[in-house]
From Swiss-Prot:
This is DNA-directed RNA polymerase subunit beta'. Its cofactor is Mg(2+); Zn(2+). Its EC number is 2.7.7.6. It catalyses: RNA(n) + a ribonucleoside 5'-triphosphate = RNA(n+1) + diphosphate. Zn(2+) 1 binds at C70, C72, C85, C88. Mg(2+) binds at D460, D462, D464. PANTHER family: DNA-DIRECTED RNA POLYMERASE (PTHR19376), DNA-DIRECTED RNA POLYMERASE SUBUNIT BETA (PTHR19376:SF54). Belongs to the RNA polymerase beta' chain family. It comes from the Bacteria. DNA-dependent RNA polymerase catalyzes the transcription of DNA into RNA using the four ribonucleoside triphosphates as substrates. GO terms for molecular function: DNA binding; DNA-directed RNA polymerase activity; magnesium ion binding; zinc ion binding.
Length: 1399
């Protein structure tokens, strides 16, 4: 018996391994795997259904069909284990060996492996240095290739067609060797001497100058070195033996009716065997060459189809005309092995059902139908019944359960007690899509779900279904309870704000009970305590909304954690006093002394979590929900058609608009305005009218008149049902109410343009047929968009997860002091995100000093929490350097200090947290809320006119940032730099707003001056680009000849004369080379120089410049000498929403990107070519001038003689992230990408922490390009992992050798995923064939560091509680002990991990 147990134990044992290597299999290796050769194409005998001998299902080779029973039935039972039957030759064993035993086919002629031939770049082609076309001609028997030229004039590797071959035979006889087919290729590969070739290439590379040639050579060198290092031999890419897959992995199943269902692979194998046998026979008969050749070609094609059908030529099809599924198709794509069976599997102990509301549940409970529970917990019930002695055998227990005896229900209740189950709703977009609950048995067939977790699941009760899973092992139950319980997931991992927030009815109820009404019953009464209020309210003596005074006892937690109790009398309402009863001790009364709108409730729960902790918050959230439901029921809020009050002014507003439109139409008819102007004006008018109607409507809805206690008529906030729903945030918005009670407004045509005639009716009045027809397009487009959006958003999430999946917190501190500079995020002058919010939950990288002193007020290494944020705001600090995932120096993974706070838990992140996946989910999950379309700016959308001044919103002190300015004679400043900014700081020195100042802006205030709110502090002309002098003197015209380089124009209206510079293409031949300029001279006519330089003050004038000064005029500092008209910015399509986010993460180069200065220096223009200008920048440090050709149609922001800094914009356009990284560095790139992505999400009102975007960015910046190889083994231009290069450089530095130099490279997320170290992860993502081919040739090792690789090989992932297991294994491995991690040790490590996460 013991023997039997050992046997069973050995069956399930898996080798412990640390890495997986993939490589090419040698023929010997294939034979060593094999249990015999398949010689016949037969499968099974159609009469007996027994496998044929030597066929594709042969029992002698692959093992018995039935457990422990040979084919002929001579040996049966376990006792004969291992015996080989002398009659049928079958070994007696388990039938499951048919899943693992392989066979082989000895090929009569070698065959090239199609992956190494056709998967680009062709490996065989690279090694042999021949083109793919040529190799194919040899392989498919179209031409001969010379293998050994001997003493002839032929060259090795030369191709000969039939004629040339026979000529050569006549000429040289058999002095040379030329063959065709795979044997020729194999010979050539066999003949390659890797060492010699590598040496030759390494010498050749430094001597070549052509870029393309260097690329080609280094590719070839890399491949050769890969072969040499991996122990693969080149000739193994040509197969001489073909392995055969075990038969149970390509099953043949008899269907009823005598037909068979078979795997396509059997057909493909059959083809190969048939052709191979025919070829053997032909060779034995020494058939004519041409027939043999044809058969060999067919064999090559058959093997190609087996390995990768359809890769070359037409795919082989089966009987039903569809292509057969080859081995390659088995592993790639969504239905392939990786994604279908390895990364996700169907699991046992699960069920699904429709969900309904469970308003009476507690937050940690879910209602589980008895029927489901009985099925899910069956084994536990059987065990319990036997243990209790209610059933003697499992069979008896089974019977009891089937009969549903009363005892069974008692046992079920006991089994379920404190056994959590997991609930999951598809699509699981973030980790809150699976949470654990304690089941409560219910009647009925639907699962009951707690309303507060609906937001996390994005669930509603209109027929959604959910799946239930049972965690079986003790560890799994422990994790479910300690980590996944819904009560532990109160905060969202995406932004750290509560996700367990009441919505809809609950919000409405809480809002209703905290509103106040004038002259309600009981107004003005004073109560002794909350209990009295409750009594009086229940007795009906005071209305819910009555204003009263109450004496309350509140306990308030101070910042240092001490608790202060105080008693005071507050002015409040009955409802608020009732609500305060459920508020936990520690929160002040003020939190409920206001109308509770959705935002306020969210803030309340957040504050509660931070002040009194998790447990109290959960109880409080539940109580809030119960209260909300109760009072929304009492309120009786409902919607009737009379709630939509249409404002009386509507008719007047629409009448006025119609009159104005008529006026514009008549202007258009008489030719005063163009079609475009008319269109814009009309649409403007209607937009305005629509806004006015909705303003009037909201004013009408939101107020009502009542009589107060003195009998006067006063206004109070309305109790209109619809207004309350919108105002509280329960449902609906002003925009929706506008369509119901205002006017629907402008609609768009299918092509996106806006129709000039709006829908003036609203839904209460009803639409006419035409109006209804106009509306249909928009409604349908919405539905189509949603479907597209879901797919695109899912794909973006998948790419993000894939790029970041191996990023796990692996250490506490990497010790870097690098970080990102954080400033308040300001947009269009408004502070969108104050500094405090941005640094919350981050670790400070360098000490923060009190402004203007040397006192450290926030030391480096501080984790900023809510109290520090207040402190930072109080001390009016406006920039802080914080640690960031981008700068973390941990080698594998990331450190806790650089990441900061775990947003979902509110403390520093634990080691083992999979921050990469969390980041990917946080960015991907709201993807479905983003828009899909690109916006065409134009018409009503771009009503924001070009800014022409800065008007400050708050009073305060002026601060000027990196602004170069000159002072005009009238005392105003003129900006002469491009990246200047003006900020306003309040009395504490905090920046409240910030504005960009364009070149030539006239600034009417000085640094440090105080301004009032609403003051205009700077002005400029938005339509022209000025050229400003920086010194005073006399104007001299150079090269300005009338009608050759300039033309004079007189304005008809004003009678003033302007000088316009002609475009080069409009000038006569004489003027093509002349460059008109304005020179500044002093009174004596001597040249003046630009301040601080020895460059003469000469301003070259670009084409179309308008000169506003006369020759010889005296001008002062800061005067405008010429203006360049700006084409009003063309209507660029602004890519918005999801496509924009995808573009940023894929690091795509935008079309017509902005041009940045490559070096700092002085601008000049060199010789022009046909369509381009030559821009020359002479660096200030005296190095080589930098030249760049720029198309003439690009509008340049700079002119001759101007100083620019590296990375400044020379020509406007969308920014290219690669340029930002190259010229301005990682921090500038981070700032750009984070802000751009946040802009898209902010527009939709979605909050995501910057950290997540930085985490993904870290993964995009993993690679570097070697610029100088030093003494390392790297080749210039190679892309390497940053960590690899740093480690190598450390080693070189310690040996006093030259280190390699590199530049950072930004990869898009798809590219970054495919270039990861792990080939398993890359292969299961995309382009499986290419990844595996490359990995096999280079003999790659996968060290299984990421999550995905470990999931594929079926291990615990190295994150969370699984990290304990992995680090324990690593420790053991280092100590060289026999590797057996026992369950108890894992348990211990697990509890330790859980304890640390609980603190």
């Amino acid at each position: 018996m013991k023997d039997l147990l050992n046997l069973l134990k050995n069956q399930g044992q898996v080798e412990e391994f640390d890495a997986i290597r993939i490589g090419l299999a040698s023929p010997e290796m294939i034979r060593s795997w094999s249990f015999g050769e398949v010689k016949k194409p037969e499968t099974i005998n159609y009469r007996t259904f027994k496998p044929e001998r030597d066929g594709l299902f042969c029992a002698k080779i692959f093992g018995p069909v039935k457990d422990y029973e040979c084919l002929c039935g001579k040996y049966k039972r376990l006792k004969h284990r291992g015996v080989i039957c002398e009659k049928c030759g079958v070994e007696v064993a388990l039938a499951k060996v048919r899943r693992e035993r392989m066979a082989h086919i000895e090929l009569a002629s070698p065959v090239a492996h199609i992956w190494f031939l056709k998967s680009l770049p062709s490996r065989i082609g690279l090694l042999m240095d021949m083109t793919l076309r040529d190799i194919e001609r040899v392989l498919y028997f179209e031409s001969y290739v010379v293998i050994d030229p001997g003493m002839t004039t032929l060259e090795k590797g030369q191709l000969l067609n039939d004629e040339q071959y026979f000529e050569a035979l006549e000429e040289f006889g058999d002095d040379f060797d030329a063959r065709m087919g795979a044997e020729a290729v194999r010979e050539l590969l066999h003949a390659i001497d890797l060492e010699h070739e590598i040496g030759r290439l390494r010498e050749e590379i430094p001597q070549t100058n052509s870029e393309t040639k260097i690329k080609k050579l280094s590719k070839r060198l890399k491949l050769m070195e890969a072969f040499q290092g991996s122990g693969n031999l080149p000739e193994w890419m040509v197969l001489t033996v073909l392995p055969v897959l075990p038969p149970d992995l390509r099953p043949l199943v008899p269907l009823d009716g005598g037909r068979f269902a078979t795997s396509d692979l059997n057909d493909l194998y059959r083809r190969v065997i048939n052709r191979n046998n025919r070829l053997k026979r032909l060779l034995d008969l020494s058939a004519p060459d041409i027939i043999v050749r044809n058969e060999k070609r067919m064999l090559q094609e058959a093997v190609d189809a087996l390995l990768d059908n359809g890769r070359r030529g037409r795919a082989i099809t089966g009987s039903n005309k569809r292509p057969l599924k080859s081995l390659a198709d088995m592993i790639k794509g969504k239905q392939g092995r990786f994604r279908q069976n390895l990364l996700g599997k169907r699991v046992d102990y699960s069920g699904r059902s429709v969900i309904t509301v469970g308003p009476t549940l507690r937050l940690h409970q879910c209602g589980l139908p008895k029927k489901m529970a009985l099925e899910l917990f069956k084994p536990f019930i059987f065990g319990k019944l036997e243990m209790r002695g209610l059933a003697t055998t499992i069979k008896a227990a089974k019977k009891m359960v089937e009969r549903e005896l009363p005892e069974v229900w008692d046992v079920l209740a006991e089994v379920i007690r404190e056994h959590p189950v997991l609930l999951n709703r598809a699509p699981t977009l973030h980790r809150l899509g699976i949470q654990a609950f304690e089941p409560v048995l219910i009647e009925g067939k639907a699962i009951q779900l707690h309303p507060l977790v609906c937001a996390a699941y994005n669930a509603d009760f209109d027929g959604d279904q959910m799946a239930v899973h049972v965690p079986l092992t003790l560890e799994a139950q422990l994790e479910a309870r300690a980590l996944m319980m819904s009560t532990n997931n109160i905060l969202s991992p995406a932004n750290g704000e509560p996700i367990i927030v009441p919505s809809q009815d609950v919000v409405l109820g809480l809002y209703y009970m905290t509103r106040e009404a004038i002259n309600a019953k009981g107004e003005g009464r004073v109560f002794a305590d909350l209990q009295e209020v409750d009594r009086v309210f229940r007795a009906g003596e005071a209305a819910l909304h009555a204003k009263i005074k109450v004496r309350i006892n509140e306990t308030v937690k101070e910042r240092d954690g001490s608790v202060v109790k105080n008693t005071r009398i507050v002015d409040t309402t009955v409802g608020r006093a009732l609500l305060f009863q459920v508020v936990p001790a520690g929160l002040p009364y003020d939190v409920v002394n206001q109308p509770m709108k959705k935002k306020a409730i969210s803030k309340l729960i957040n504050q509660c979590y931070r002040v009194v902790g998790l447990k109290e918050t959960v109880i409080f959230a539940d109580q809030l929900m119960y209260t909300g439901f109760a009072y929304s029921t009492i309120s009786g809020v409902s919607i009737g058609v009379n709630d939509f009050v249409i404002p009386d002014e509507k008719a007047r507003i629409i009448g006025n608009a119609t009159d104005e439109v008529k006026e514009i139409e008549s202007q258009y008819a008489s030719g005063l305005v163009t079609q475009g102007e008319k269109y814009n004006k009309v649409i403007d008018l209607w937009s305005k009218a629509n806004d006015e109607v909705s303003k009037a409507m909201m004013a009408n809805l939101s107020k009502e008149k009542v009589i107060d206690r003195e009998g006067k008529e006063v206004e109070q906030e309305s109790f209109n049902s619809m207004y309350m729903m919108a105002d509280s945030g329960a449902r609906g918005s002003a925009a929706q109410i506008r369509q119901l009670a205002g006017m629907r407004g402008l609609m768009a045509k299918p092509d996106g343009s806006i129709i000039e005639t709006p829908i003036t009716a609203n839904f209460r009045e009803g639409l006419s047929v035409l109006q209804y027809f106009i509306s249909t397009h928009g409604a349908r487009k919405g539905l189509a968009d949603t479907a597209l959006k879901t797919a695109n958003s899912g794909y973006l999430t998948r790419r993000l997860v894939d790029v970041a999946q191996d990023l796990v917190v692996t250490e506490i501190d990497c010790g870097t002091d690098q970080g990102l500079v954080m400033t308040p995020h300001i947009e269009g002058g408004d502070v969108v995100e104050p500094l405090g919010e941005r640094v919350l939950g981050r670790v400070i990288a360098r000490d923060v000093f009190k402004p203007g002193t040397e006192d450290v007020i926030v030391p480096a290494g501080t984790l900023v929490d809510e109290q520090w944020v207040e402190f930072i705001e109080l001390n009016s600090i406006d920039e802080v350097i914080v640690r960031s995932p981008i700068n973390c120096e941990t080698r594998y993974g990331i450190c806790a200090k650089c990441y900061g706070r775990d947003l979902a838990r509110g403390h520093q992140v634990n080691i083992g947290e999979a921050v990469g996946v969390i980041a990917a989910q946080s960015i991907g999950e709201p993807g479905t809320q983003l828009t899909m379309r690109t916006f065409h700016i134009g018409g009503a959308a771009s009503r924001t006119s070009a800014a022409d001044s800065v008007q400050v919103k708050n009073g305060g002190m002026v601060r000027l940032h990196n602004l170069k300015q000159v002072e005009r004679a009238d005392g105003n400043l003129v900006a002469v730099s491009r990246s200047g900014e003006l900020a306003i700081a309040d009395e504490f020195g905090r920046e409240r707003e910030r504005y960009k100042l364009p070149y030539g802006a006239v600034i009417s205030v000085k640094e440090g001056e105080k301004v009032e709110a609403g003051a205009i502090v700077a002005k400029w002309d938005p339509h022209t680009h000025p050229i400003v002098t920086e010194l005073k003197g006399t104007v001299t015209f150079v090269g300005m000849e009338e009608n050759i380089t300039i033309k004079r124009q007189t304005d008809e209206l004003t009678g003033l004369t302007n000088i316009e510079v002609l475009d080069v293409k409009d000038r006569p031949a004489a003027g093509k080379e002349i460059r008109p300029a304005i020179k500044m001279v002093d009174a004596a006519g001597k040249d003046l120089y630009l301040p601080g330089t020895d460059v003469p003050a000469q301003y070259f004038l670009p084409a179309n410049a308008l000169v506003g000064v006369a020759d010889g005029a005296q001008i002062g500092v800061g005067d405008v000498i010429a203006r360049i008209p700006q084409e009003t910015s063309k209507t660029r399509d602004i890519t918005g929403g999801l496509p924009r986010v995808a573009d940023l993460f894929e690091a795509r180069r935008p079309k017509e990107a902005s041009i940045l200065a490559e070096v700092s220096g002085t601008i000049a223009f060199g010789k022009e070519t046909k369509g381009k200008r030559r821009l020359v920048i002479t660096p200030t440090d005296g190095s080589e001038p930098y030249e760049e050709l720029i198309p003439k149609w690009r509008h340049l922001n700079v002119f001759e003689g101007e100083q620019v800094n590296r990375g400044e914009v020379i020509s406007d356009g969308p920014s290219d992230p690669h340029d930002i990284l190259r010229l301005l560095g990682v921090s500038a790139l981070a700032k750009y990408i984070v802000n751009e992505i946040q802009d898209v999400y902010r527009l939709q009102g979605v909050k995501i922490n910057d950290k997540h975007i930085e985490t993904i960015l870290r993964q995009m910046l993993r690679k570097v390009e070697i610029s100088e190889s030093g003494d390392s083994s790297f080749i210039k231009g190679d892309q390497m992992e940053l960590t690899q290069v740093l480690v190598e450089n450390e080693r070189l530095a310690s040996e006093d050798k030259f280190i390699s130099k590199f530049t950072r490279v930004l990869l898009g997320i798809t590219k970054a995923s495919l270039s990861t170290e792990s080939f398993i992860s890359a292969a299961s993502f995309q382009e499986t064939t290419r990844v595996l081919t490359e990995a096999a040739v280079t003999g790659k090792r996968d060290y299984l560091r990421g999550l995905k690789e470990n999931v594929v090989v079926g291990r615990l992932i190295p994150a969370g509680t699984g990290l304990a297991y992995h680090s324990e294994r690593k420790r053991r491995r280092d100590a060289d002990k026999p590797l057996r991690v026992s369950a108890s040790e894992v348990e211990a490590a697990l509890t330790e991990a859980l304890n640390s996460s609980g603190n």
